[in-house]
UniProtKB/Swiss-Prot annotation:
It comes from Vibrio atlanticus (strain LGP32). It holds the Pfam family Ribosomal_L2. GO terms for molecular function: rRNA binding; structural constituent of ribosome; transferase activity. One of the primary rRNA binding proteins. Required for association of the 30S and 50S subunits to form the 70S ribosome, for tRNA binding and peptide bond formation. It has been suggested to have peptidyltransferase activity; this is somewhat controversial. Makes several contacts with the 16S rRNA in the 70S ribosome. Keywords: Ribonucleoprotein, Ribosomal protein, RNA-binding, rRNA-binding. NCBIfam families: rplB_bact. This is Large ribosomal subunit protein uL2.
Length: 274
C-alpha cells in the first residue's frame, strides 16, 4: 500500500492524496453477492429531505458482507481483496471448503491465499472469528457483536479495532478507539486483529467534485441562510448568528450531550474521551 501525492497539473489535482493498494482485485466483483443499491437523495417516502447533504454520486451495487461469520469449523481460503464503494474498509472474498463464497471485512495482515476459520476451536490469529469468551484478555479484535447472533456492529470501518480488557461472568469489557469502555455479552463474536486499510484517513479528496462523486453535497452555514431556514439566519449584512451555535432544529451543537438511550447506560463503563 502506498500514499501517492499527485502532481499539481491542475487546480483540482494540486491537493489530491491517494491511497494505492496494488493487492486489490482489478476486475469485477463476485456477481452472486451483489444487490441493487438505489439512491433516494436523502428523501423519505413523502419526498422531504430527512438527511441533508446527500444526492448524486456514482452508481454502485451493494456487496453482501457476512457480518455473522457462522460457518463454524469449515476452513476458508481468501481468494482476493476488493474495493468496496459502500465503506471505508476493503473486503475479502473467501472460498469455504464446502464451495460457498462470502465477502468479509478484510483484516489487517490478511492477504490472498491465507486460511481463516470461525468457531470456538479457531486459532487466535488475524481473520479468525470466535466468541469473545474464547478470546484471551488483551487481544485486539474488530467486527464486534453487541447482541449474539445479530452480526458485527462495532469496529467495522478502516483501521478500527477494540481491545478486550476484562472478563466478568457473562460479560467482557472492551475499549474502543474513541476511548469508551463498555460491557458486551461474552457469547457475542468478534474477529481477531484490526480492520485493514488504515491509511484511508490519510487520503485527501482534493476538490469538491470528488465529494460529489461519492454522493456528498455541500454543507451551507446557517449564518448565510434566511431566518426561515435556520436559527442563525437573517440580519443586515454579515452577522455572528446572535446566539450560541445550534442545529437547524435548535439543538445546541457544541458540548451538548444528545445520547438518549438510558436503557443501555449501564453497559458503558466509561464515556468516550473528547
Amino acid at each position: 500500500m502506498a500514499i501517492v501525492k499527485c502532481k499539481p497539473t491542475s487546480p483540482g489535482r494540486r491537493h489530491v492524496v491517494k491511497v494505492v493498494n496494488a493487492d486489490l482485485h482489478k476486475g469485477k466483483p463476485y456477481a452472486p453477492l451483489l444487490e441493487k443499491n438505489s439512491k433516494n437523495g436523502g428523501r423519505n417516502n413523502n419526498g422531504r429531505i430527512t438527511v441533508r447533504h446527500i444526492g448524486g454520486g456514482h452508481k454502485h451495487h451493494y456487496r453482501l458482507v457476512d457480518f455473522k461469520r457462522t460457518k463454524d469449523g469449515i476452513p476458508a481460503k481468501v481468494e482476493r481483496l476488493e474495493y468496496d464503494p459502500n465503506r471505508s474498509a476493503n473486503i475479502a472474498l473467501v472460498l469455504y471448503a464446502d464451495g460457498e463464497r462470502r465477502y468479509i471485512i478484510a483484516p489487517k495482515g490478511v492477504n490472498a491465499g491465507d486460511q481463516i476459520q470461525s468457531g470456538v476451536d479457531a486459532a487466535i490469529k488475524a481473520g479468525n472469528t470466535l466468541p469473545m469468551r474464547n478470546i484471551p484478555v488483551g487481544s485486539t479484535v474488530h467486527c464486534v457483536e453487541l447482541k449474539p447472533g445479530k452480526g458485527a456492529q462495532l469496529a467495522r470501518s478502516a483501521g478500527a479495532y477494540a481491545q478486550i480488557i476484562a472478563r466478568d461472568g457473562a460479560y467482557v469489557t472492551i475499549r474502543l478507539r474513541s476511548g469508551e469502555m463498555r460491557k458486551v455479552l461474552s457469547e457475542g463474536r468478534a474477529t481477531i486483529g484490526e480492520v485493514g486499510n488504515s491509511e484511508h484517513m490519510l487520503r485527501e479528496l482534493g476538490k469538491a467534485g470528488a465529494s460529489r462523486w461519492r454522493g456528498v453535497r455541500p454543507t451551507v452555514r446557517g449564518v448565510v441562510m434566511n431566518p426561515v431556514d435556520h436559527p442563525h439566519g437573517g440580519g443586515e449584512g454579515r452577522t455572528s448568528g446572535g446566539r450560541h451555535p445550534v442545529s437547524p432544529w435548535g439543538v445546541p451543537t457544541k458540548g451538548f450531550k444528545t445520547r438518549k438511550n438510558k436503557r443501555t447506560d449501564k453497559y458503558i463503563v466509561r464515556r468516550r474521551t473528547k
